[in-house]
Amino acid sequence: MLFDVKVPILGFETIHKMRLQKIDEIFLRLSSAEENSVVSFTLVNPFALRKYEFEVPTPLKILLELEEAKSVLVANIMVVQTPIELSTVNYLAPLIFNFDKQLMGQVVLDSNKYPHYHLRENILSHTHE
């Protein structure tokens, strides 16, 4: 599914259209849908790995039209390593997808408000919660 990027991914501010593909119940692939761009990310469903909750800032709710949305997805960027147990997840900057309006954006959480989330956490660090 194609999404309009309303709040860009940090470091990729020039990308305005992205394609999301489901791999399985836990993993997804996000790639640029623009010509001459080969940007691609592996995403993970954070709720499959740990307890995960945060407040979406009001400006982001407005930009992504979340108030009326019925189908919303939260996913996190994952850096895949070999073996998979060495992979890391960015819990401090989740991506939010509004499937109803095909809008997406990245929210950067305040590390003071969410000290238990980090930019690079081992994928297995919360498997026993």
Swiss-Prot record:
Alphabetized Gene3D superfamilies for the sequence: BH3618-like
InterPro entries cross-referenced by the UniProt entry: Flagellar_assembly_factor_FliW (IPR003775), Flagellar_assmbl_FliW_dom_sf (IPR024046)
Record's GO cellular component terms: cytoplasm
Keywords: Bacterial flagellum biogenesis, Chaperone, Cytoplasm, Translation regulation
GO BP field: bacterial-type flagellum assembly; regulation of translation
Top-rank lineage group of the source organism: Bacteria
Function: Acts as an anti-CsrA protein, binds CsrA and prevents it from repressing translation of its target genes, one of which is flagellin. Binds to flagellin and participates in the assembly of the flagellum.
Subunit structure, as described in the record: Interacts with translational regulator CsrA and flagellin(s).
Family that this chain belongs to: Belongs to the FliW family.
Name by which UniProt lists this protein: Flagellar assembly factor FliW 1
